[in-house]
Regions:
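Short amphipathic recognition helices of helix-turn-helix/homeodomain-type DNA-binding modules
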Residues: 55, 62-93
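A short, Lys/Arg-rich alpha-helix, primarily the initiator
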Residues: 1-23
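Hydrophobic protein-protein interaction segments
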Residues: 101-106, 126-261, 266-280
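Conserved hydrophobic beta-strand signature of PAS-family and PAS-like sensory domains
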Residues: 121-122
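Short, basic-rich loop-to-helix N-cap that marks the start of a DNA-contacting helix
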Residues: 47-60
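Alpha-helical residues within the helix-turn-helix
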Residues: 21, 32, 61
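Short alpha-helical DNA-recognition segment
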Residues: 24-42
Length: 280
């Protein structure tokens, strides 16, 4: 039985007790089903004992908890839940795909893209195609696989601005910490790919450490030979509560909004826009 640290309060006990009462189980009944002892369950609930990952998995199974609520139990005990791969294109998520199509369509003419936690592109809107077609060929657009790589590889500057350097630094910092916390090789691969981009500042770690990440940041792009500022806004699509950052499918919608209110992006819209990830 692992002992809980006296100076590290845990919310695991109250949460476990909540689920036990929800299922109308006594400590004895829960212990029997979880191959444990009544004393151990009691110690878990009053904070005298700290659960192992294996114990949490067993309790989640016995209590018939879904991924969202299992994540809550793990977070309450101080563990980062392991991500489970979920195929966004699985037929059982057709309802979610339809909702995302409506969302992306409503954002036209502003360029918007749906991606997974690694930045892999899942869907784009017509605004995205028309906008990026100003700087990239149709072939390059069709072959784009990762939001971050595409965004920075096809919008290079002769002399990268401080805004771009800071943006790259923040994205790298996010990927690096995700990689270290989750030990997910996909994040590590994504980090290495971004680090290899030509405009990455050599002091990206210190830059990112001095900046506070936000849901929106500025990016600068050359549109018709004129430097324009855009707000890059990312919105999370996931479960309510803290598990939105760990439960799957963890989706992100990124949209670019021009800082200049007079910049009309509808001029890039046309009926002939096409892309493998355009679903309407």
């Amino acid at each position: 039985m692992a002992n809980a640290s006296n100076d590290m309060p845990s919310n695991f006990g109250p949460l476990l007790k909540f689920w036990r009462n929800t299922h109308e189980l006594s400590q004895e009944a829960l212990a029997l089903s979880a191959d444990s002892s009544t004393r151990h369950i009691s110690c878990l609930e009053n904070g005298k004992s700290h659960p192992s990952r294996t114990m949490i998995d067993k309790l989640s199974e016995v209590l018939n908890l879904g991924e969202r609520d299992s994540c809550y139990l793990q977070l309450a005990a101080g563990y980062l839940p392991a991500a489970k791969f979920i195929d966004f294109h699985d037929p059982k998520y057709n309802w979610l795909k339809k909702a995302m199509i409506l969302t992306l369509k409503a954002m036209d003419p502003f360029p918007a893209a749906l991606m997974d936690r690694y930045g892999k592109l899942l869907m784009v809107n017509k605004g995205w195609i028309g906008f990026h077609r100003q700087v990239a060929s149709q072939a390059a657009l069709d072959q784009a696989q990762n939001h971050y790589e595409f965004l920075f590889a096809h919008h290079q500057e002769h002399t990268p601005s401080e805004v771009k350097k800071n943006t790259l630094a923040l994205i790298l910092m996010a990927m690096k910490q995700e990689s270290l916390l989750s030990q997910d090789s996909n994040f590590a691969d994504m980090f290495d790919a971004l680090l290899a981009l030509p405009d990455v500042p050599s002091d990206w770690e210190k830059r990112a450490a001095s900046l506070e990440p936000q849901a929106s940041f500025k990016v600068q792009m050359d549109i018709n030979h004129v430097q324009q500022n855009f707000y890059s806004v990312s919105q999370m699509v996931g479960a309510l509560g803290p598990t939105s950052f760990v439960s799957e499918p963890r989706l992100i919608i990124n949209t670019l909004y021009p800082e200049n209110p007079d910049l009309d992006l509808s001029q890039h819209m046309s009926d002939d826009l096409s892309h493998p990830l355009l679903a309407y």
